[in-house]
């Protein structure tokens, strides 16, 4: 097991991301957010886009999981947008990420053989770079492990793809996590819809080797929205 992966076992990763339509968009804000996460005891960080990764790496000294989102005009349920190509992977690796994360789902637009070719190409070009497989189903987890080019399996996309959206859970997908732990030997990162301490307790009891938390920490408008919506329900507004 890679030493960087070992550092994250039994740990908490905080995802620091902001989009152009939000006030916190910008590398300086993400670096500040990452510093706050490290101050709070985070074991690792997840950052998006080369410029943000460079800023976060300069501000913090804990492992950074790098992704490179490339959005298209189609339905997000059908699009591969988390580090979808070798070129997008190269950009964040050269920006200094410690672990590369990419979409390892199987789609109509990209069958497994194409994904396998991408993973082999990345491993050949960057043999020392640990790879996290962001996926949505048990089948994808098993196939990703079988390639021998993946170091961590992550439930990042559970509920966010066409073939998993119908079974999307309100909180983290505990059943998927349990199934992956039974079927695979690689470390499993629980990620997606972990909002409360109760959610964290559930994924830990289900066997998660590490946990990544994003919106519940780093997206203030969504955090606010949850409280506001609950308040509205209380007053039937």
Segments from the language model and where they lie:
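C-terminal alpha-helical cap/extension of soluble enzyme domains
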Residues: 4-5, 10-24, 170-237
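Conserved N-terminal beta1-alpha1 strand-loop-helix module at the mouth
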Residues: 1-90, 139-152, 195, 232
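Active-site-adjacent beta->alpha loops and helix N-cap segments on the catalytic face
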Residues: 24-27, 46-66, 79-84, 104-122, ...
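Short beta-strand elements of ligand-binding domains
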Residues: 65-68, 133, 189-192
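A contiguous pocket-lining binding segment that forms or flanks enzyme active sites
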Residues: 122, 127-134
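Conserved beta-strand positions in the central sheet of alpha/beta enzyme cores
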Residues: 13, 46, 100-102, 132, ...
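Glycine-enriched alpha-helix->loop->beta-strand junction motifs that scaffold or abut catalytic
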Residues: 41, 60-64, 94-99, 125-128, ...
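Glycine-rich phosphate-binding active-site loops on the catalytic face of alpha/beta enzymes
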Residues: 17, 68-72, 91, 95-109, ...
């Amino acid at each position: 097991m890679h030493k960087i992966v070992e550092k994250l076992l039994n740990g908490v990763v905080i995802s620091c991301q902001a989009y152009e339509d939000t006030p916190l968009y910008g590398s300086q804000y993400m670096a500040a957010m990452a510093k706050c996460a490290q101050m709070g005891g985070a074991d690792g960080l997840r950052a998006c886009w080369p410029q943000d990764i460079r800023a976060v790496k300069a501000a913090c000294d804990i492992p950074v999981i790098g992704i490179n989102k490339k959005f298209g005009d189609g339905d997000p349920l059908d699009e591969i947008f988390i580090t979808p190509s070798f070129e997008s992977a190269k950009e964040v690796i050269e920006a200094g990420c410690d672990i590369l994360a990419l979409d390892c789902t199987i789609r109509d637009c990209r069958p497994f053989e194409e994904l396998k070719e991408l993973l082999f190409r990345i491993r050949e070009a960057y043999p020392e770079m640990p790879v996290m497989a962001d996926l949505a189903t048990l089948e994808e987890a098993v196939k990703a492990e079988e390639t021998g080019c993946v170091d961590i399996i992550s439930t990042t996309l559970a509920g966010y793809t066409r073939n998993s959206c119908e079974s999307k859970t309100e909180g983290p997908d505990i059943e998927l996590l349990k199934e992956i732990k039974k079927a695979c030997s690689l470390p499993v990162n629980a990620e997606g819809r972990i909002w409360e301490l109760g959610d964290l307790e559930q994924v830990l009891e289900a066997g998660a080797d590490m946990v990544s938390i994003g919106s519940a920490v780093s997206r203030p408008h969504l955090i606010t929205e949850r409280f506001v919506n609950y308040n509205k329900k209380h007053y039937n507004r």
